[in-house]
Curated annotation (Swiss-Prot):
Transmembrane segments: none annotated. Residues 1-75 form the GIY-YIG domain. It comes from Halobacterium salinarum (strain ATCC 700922 / JCM 11081 / NRC-1). It comes from the Archaea. Belongs to the UPF0213 family. Pfam families: GIY-YIG. Signal peptide: none annotated. This is UPF0213 protein VNG_2274C. InterPro entries: GIY-YIG_endonuc, GIY-YIG_endonuc_sf, UPF0213_domain.
Length: 77
């Protein structure tokens, strides 16, 4: 399975990403091994996930979520 996730950083901002293992990826973010954006904003909290059968579907959804406003992202969860 392919997943898109939204995490909330310690400064209140949101980060959206793609992974095949959500729990591992969130742990990487919290360990400082995730995206550069989240490294100085730990701890992070998982707020939303969506699962897809194909990587291309997940990547399209990730892009769409990244285009949403903060309020629209919050409506997801």
């Amino acid at each position: 399975m392919h997943h898109v996730y939204v995490i909330e950083c310690s400064d209140g901002t949101y980060y959206t990403g793609y992974t095949t293992d959500v729990q591992r990826r969130v742990a990487e973010h919290n360990a400082g091994d995730g995206a550069k954006y989240t490294r100085g904003r730990t701890p992070v909290t998982l707020r939303h996930t969506e699962s897809f059968d194909s990587k291309s579907e997940a990547m399209r959804r990730e892009y769409r979520i990244k285009q949403l406003s903060r309020a629209q992202k919050e409506a997801l969860f």
